[in-house]
């Protein structure tokens, strides 16, 4: 005959009486205030910051009255990533979202319950749980003053935590606890073990201790309820070996192994019971005396006496607060095989903390029941152990998932732990918060580190959000993306300009739309001519600077007073040769102060009939105003020390002109390796000017380099670029680990940032193809993210010549349809990966 378990309605045993004024009131008159807690992001906290977080928890708990319970509940629930697209995205954006669709990850939410209970309730054992009896109201229910004092202490607790700058607490409203018609509340979520935003189906709760179930979910419980199960010592944090090196540390909280590092559905519960400290110590004194008197009969009594004395000595000499503590991991699965795996995984993670895994099969229902929000006062006293407040808080999980930026603008990067997309704003939101003062970016990544993939990924998303982008490249890194944009816009955008002998890049430095020459325009002209005149390592004398400035200003006066004169470099050269020569002769400027003949001789190749006469005498301007994606490819002249700096300056001046015309529109100039041509002492002021000016016009300048020696050896880089780039982006630096001290000093990196950077690509997931990247903002906010792209994006971004040629050949076979060729290539890549996986 089948045994039938006794059943009852949840309502008959439910321990919560009401939720009023945002407080949970139990049927035993316990009052609970609930909070949602925002913890720091995983892998972004240092040992010192963990100690600060620990100290804040301790300080906050000390303001709570006796017989309070601090119950921290961390939920870790498996979910699948859902695409956020609305059908209006670009081809590559859709591919990106499709690539990640349904990817599983562990979602974390942290709640904190502060409960005021009574002396009698604090001592009750599991056999006196509300699961087993009715309700007896304590006499304290009539003491309204104790309630008021508790609520005042809760407010102090909240202020202390929020003022710390590391942890944020938000008090939950009544509807968030009990739920609404549209959304389940916290209590309903706990009773169904689900974090969905829709009401779950009603389910039976089976409270069999050995096989507890909630609907189809089978539960297992591991507890830390005895000091014998704990390690000999605990700390605020621990070294995470997988992301550490012999030159850097990655730190995690002591309880991190049972947090995000435990990849299954689970709730990690941490209880701290604040009883009467004096009463606890008196009881310990009595126990100590008893152990001493019985020590002759058993050696264990003598050992217990010594432990009790040590505990009392610590409490009295250091002023430590004695408390009771309990932690447990409640995990669940929907089939027996998975449940067995989860049991083993949970036990292994507890062992990583130095704890003895204790699988509880007796008190699972009672411990689950006391975990109901507002019912912490029902916790069985025998499941807790005595310790000090400082040690108890060490068992708190202190980190959470990466968070997306609450901003409409940004880029999609990937969480390095779970591999799901994040929305990251590294420009606007940090500016509004005062984290950075400019949007400029400095990118450092050696060859093969994924630098081109990241920059392609960055500019593609900026472009799709309306940014005007101008790129100066020397390696055809953006050819695929530019071609795709060109095809999608039917030639209206995606302009790819290469320097060719029969069609060179040219412009007129003396041309302006309005005919006006402000200070900035005059300075750019002087910088250009100085670059033509002086060698890279040759700084001008003060007298030469004055003479050049006088020549430029005098010529500008001439062309502004006489509009019939066509301004160009030829006209300037002739003006200096004839008119300005007479002017300096009248001033009696000595030849050693300004050698005008030497000046003209050096500039002659750029004058009419010279080798480069086309460069600065263009009769038409590069009209880039309405083109949003332009690439200047300068690979053909990357080794020409005369042309490269001049052409790069021309392009930058063109960008500045565009920048001034487009009001209220985001602009970006990204300069790849050719920035090195601009690093002479003569150009440092102009580079500083560019980096400072773009901020005023809603723009950002981005410099990309791969050689560490370039930044170590050039003081101009530090003064002109690094100091004016509040966003620094570094890729894998392992090959420069021995040189990293120099890089750290030059970039002004903290030890925390150093540890993050050297952890890049140390523990990548073997089944995913991605490269990690470190992003630092203003020296105060930083983290490592992953650049993972879809197969379609890979086909567009790749810099491998064989892969680029394969794509171009296929596009030609398909009648020039590049998008279709990208889709075909991506499908081939997916088929290869599937076949390799099967093999």
Region spans (language model):
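A short, charged
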Residues: 443-467, 809-839
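Short glycine/proline-enriched loop/turn "hinge" motifs that connect secondary-structure elements
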Residues: 23-29, 101-106, 317-322, 414-416, ...
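P-loop NTPase motor domains
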Residues: 40, 47-63, 262, 355, ...
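Conserved P-loop NTPase
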Residues: 750-811
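Extended, folded cores of ATP/NTP-driven motor/assembly subunits in large transport
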Residues: 1-399
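Conserved P-loop NTPase motor cores
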Residues: 427-460, 469-481, 495-503, 635-755, ...
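Short secondary-structure boundary/capping segments
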Residues: 85-90, 126-131, 374-377, 484-489, ...
């Amino acid at each position: 005959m089948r045994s039938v378990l006794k059943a009852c309605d949840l309502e008959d045993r439910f321990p919560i009486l009401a939720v009023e004024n945002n407080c949970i009131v139990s049927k035993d008159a316990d009052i609970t205030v609930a909070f949602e807690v925002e913890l720091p992001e995983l892998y972004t906290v240092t040992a010192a910051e963990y100690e600060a977080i620990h100290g804040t928890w301790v300080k906050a708990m000390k303001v709570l009255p006796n017989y309070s319970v601090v119950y921290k509940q961390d939920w870790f629930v498996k979910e699948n990533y859902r695409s956020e697209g609305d059908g209006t995205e670009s081809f590559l954006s859709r591919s990106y979202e499709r690539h990640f669709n349904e990817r599983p990850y562990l979602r974390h939410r942290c709640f904190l319950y502060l409960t005021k209970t009574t002396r009698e309730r604090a001592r009750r054992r599991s056999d006196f749980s509300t699961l087993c009896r009715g309700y007896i109201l304590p006499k304290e229910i009539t003491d309204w003053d104790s309630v008021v004092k508790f609520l005042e202490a809760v407010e102090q607790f909240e202020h202390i935590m929020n003022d710390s700058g590391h942890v944020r607490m938000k008090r939950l409203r009544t509807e968030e606890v009990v739920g609404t018609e549209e959304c389940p509340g916290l209590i309903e979520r706990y009773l169904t073990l689900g974090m969905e935003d829709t009401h779950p189906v009603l389910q039976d709760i089976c409270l069999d201790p050995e096989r507890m179930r909630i609907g189809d979910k089978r539960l297992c419980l591991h507890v830390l309820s005895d000091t014998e199960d704990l390690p000999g010592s605990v700390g605020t944090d621990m070294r995470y070996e997988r992301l550490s090196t012999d030159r850097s540390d990655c730190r995690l909280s002591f309880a991190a192994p049972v947090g995000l590092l435990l990849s299954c559905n689970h709730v990690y519960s941490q209880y701290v019971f604040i009883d009467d400290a004096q009463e606890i110590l008196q009881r310990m004194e009595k126990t100590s005396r008893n152990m001493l008197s019985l020590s002759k009969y058993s050696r264990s009594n003598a050992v217990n006496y010594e432990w009790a004395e040590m505990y009392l000595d610590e409490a009295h000499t250091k002023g430590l607060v004695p408390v009771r503590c309990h932690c447990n991991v409640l995990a669940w699965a929907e089939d027996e095989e998975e449940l067995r795996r989860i049991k083993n995984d949970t036990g292994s993670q507890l062992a990583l903390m130095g704890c003895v895994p204790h699988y509880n099969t007796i008190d699972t229902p009672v411990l689950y029941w006391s975990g109901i929000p507002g019912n912490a006062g029902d916790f069985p006293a025998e499941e807790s152990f005595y310790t000090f407040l400082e040690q108890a808080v060490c068992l708190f999980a202190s980190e959470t998932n990466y968070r997306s930026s609450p901003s409409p603008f940004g880029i999609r990067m990937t969480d390095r732990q779970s591999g799901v997309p994040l929305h990251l704003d590294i420009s606007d939101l940090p500016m509004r918060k005062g984290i950075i003062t400019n949007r400029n970016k400095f990118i450092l990544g050696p060859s093969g580190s994924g630098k081109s993939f990241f920059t392609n990924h960055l500019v593609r998303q900026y472009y799709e959000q309306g940014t005007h982008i101008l790129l100066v490249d020397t390696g055809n890194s953006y050819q695929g993306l530019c071609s795709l944009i060109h095809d999608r816009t039917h030639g209206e955008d995606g302009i790819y300009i290469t320097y060719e002998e029969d069609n060179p890049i040219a412009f007129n430095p003396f041309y302006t739309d309005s005919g006006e020459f402000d200070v900035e325009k005059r300075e750019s002209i002087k910088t250009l001519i100085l670059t033509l005149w002086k060698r890279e390592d040759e700084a001008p004398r003060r007298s030469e600077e004055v003479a050049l400035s006088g020549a430029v200003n005098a010529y500008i006066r001439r062309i502004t007073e006489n509009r019939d004169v066509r301004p160009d470099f030829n006209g300037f050269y002739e003006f200096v040769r004839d008119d300005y020569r007479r002017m300096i002769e009248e001033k009696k400027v000595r030849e050693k102060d300004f050698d005008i003949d030497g000046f003209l001789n050096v500039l002659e190749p750029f004058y009419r009939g010279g080798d480069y006469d086309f460069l600065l005498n263009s009769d038409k301007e590069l009209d880039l105003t309405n083109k949003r994606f332009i690439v200047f490819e300068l690979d053909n002249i990357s080794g020409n020390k005369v042309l490269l700096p001049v052409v790069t300056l021309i392009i930058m001046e063109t960008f500045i002109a565009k920048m001034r015309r487009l009001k209220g529109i985001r602009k970006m100039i990204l300069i790849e390796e050719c920035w090195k041509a601009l690093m002479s002492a003569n150009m440092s002021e102009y580079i500083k000017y560019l980096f400072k000016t773009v901020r005023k016009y809603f723009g950002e300048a981005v410099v990309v380099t791969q050689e560490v020696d370039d930044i170590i050896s050039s003081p101009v880089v530090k003064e002109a670029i690094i100091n004016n780039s509040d966003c620094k982006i570094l890729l894998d630096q392992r090959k420069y680990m021995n040189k990293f001290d120099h890089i750290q000093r030059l970039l002004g990196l903290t030890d925390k940032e150093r540890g993050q950077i050297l952890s890049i690509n140390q523990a990548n997931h073997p089944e995913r193809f991605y490269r990690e990247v470190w992003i630092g903002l203003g020296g105060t906010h930083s983290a490592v993210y992953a650049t993972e792209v879809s197969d379609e994006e890979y086909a567009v971004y790749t810099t491998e010549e064989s892969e680029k040629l394969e794509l171009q050949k296929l596009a030609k076979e398909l009648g020039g349809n590049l998008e279709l060729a990208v889709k075909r290539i991506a499908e081939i890549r997916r088929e290869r990966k599937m076949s390799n996986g099967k093999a």
